[in-house]
Structures are given as structure tokens and as C-alpha cells.
């Protein structure tokens, strides 16, 4: 019994270490780092494109996500961040050259350019003035 308990505890500890050591997928956007997870939010609202959630950002702050668009807190490293979703294809037509009348606009009242640079432009506008 003691041996089984010891092996069980050892296995749980090893599983915990592996889980914590798992690297988050990071990508650069302008001057900021992000972690991404695939997330399909309201799939049929605009198109069947892949929606993305930014849940880890160095400069993250609550004003970037409206109250009703916050889904949950997600852990990234030792900190927790809001998860918010958007799509690269910012008008839902599948070509990534949208005019911004999309989920980005509904979230932030702004205009995206279809290739993800919306984030950099929006952040630059907030932080560089």
C-alpha cells in the first residue's frame, strides 16, 4: 500500500511538472508578445474562419475588452489575463482584406486591415500619444 501510494504521488508530481513546463505558443505583433490558442467564437456569426484569442500580452489591460466580451481569465506564466477574441479576416469574406465591419469593430469600434495589424495600430494609438 505504501509503495503504491508513493508511486502515485511521484506520478502526480511528474505530471504537474510536465504541465507547468509546457511552453506557450508565442508570436510577435509589433512590439508586443502574445500567446495564442485556437478558439471558435460564434462560428456562424461572420464566416467559418478561425477566430483567435489573445490571452497573454505584456501590455494587457481591461479597457481592451468590453465587459460582455470577457470570457474567462487564462494563465500565462505566473500571471492571469483576460481572453478576448477576434479574427484576422476582418470582414468575414475569407480573403483577409476586409473593411473592418466585423468582430473587431464590434469589440473595439475600430477598423482592422485584415492581416492582424489592427492590434499594433490600436495599441500604438493608445500608448504612443
Swiss-Prot record:
Cell location: Secreted, Extracellular space, Extracellular matrix
Keywords, in A-Z order: Disulfide bond, Extracellular matrix, Repeat, Secreted, Signal
Signal peptide: 1-23
GO cellular component: extracellular region
Keyword Lyase set for record: no
Keyword set includes Repeat: yes
Sequence-type repeats, residues: 91-92, 93-94, 95-96, 97-98, 99-100
Superkingdom per UniProt: Eukaryota
Stretches the record annotates as 5 X 2 AA tandem repeats of N-G: 91-100
Tissue and organ distribution: Component of conchiolin, the organic matrix of nacre. Specifically expressed in mantle epithelium.
Cited function: May be specifically involved in the formation of the nacreous layer.
Protein family (similarity comment): Belongs to the N16 matrix protein family.
Subunit structure of this chain's protein: Heterooligomer; disulfide-linked. Pif97, Pif80, N16 and other proteins form a complex.
Protein name: N16.5 matrix protein
Species whose genome carries this gene: Pinctada fucata (Akoya pearl oyster)
